[in-house]
Amino acid sequence: MTKMDLVMFEEEFEQLQEIIGRLQVDSASKVVFLVDKNGQQIAASGDVRSIDATSLASLTAGNVAATDGLAKLIGEKEFSLLFHEGEKDNLHISIVGKRGILVVIFDQSSSLALVRLRVKKASRELAEIFERVEQRASTQASETARFESPFSEITDEDIDKLFGD
């Protein structure tokens, strides 16, 4: 089964934005990004001006995909958490539900323990929203499948006849 595109309403987006905004403040992080596993940014909070969000989103998705490959090599389903420690800034990357990736950038003014604690709570809330979005998409897809297009029986030959080719 192929994955459906993630389509959400404004209300759901605002809920996601509120959760990551709260996470950014509560964890004393510089920036929080929510991206999907395809590398598309969904939402962000914090000082994002100095960061190339598009590159960050796609590289994070690639990092998660590569790490999934490593997990499978050693018999794990996945590694749900990645941590990269730098001289000034650190990256905490975690999987949210089946589709999301939460990226938290923090420095020495916060701690890994605080970030992990706050991410755990936010991840549960975000996963619930993703689940609702996927359930709605699944319901809409099954309703659409029952709809038969009036154009489904038109062939290229019929179009050529119509325009006199």
Regions found by a protein language model. Name each.
Residues 2-29, 38, 42-165:
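Acidic, low-complexity cytosolic segments
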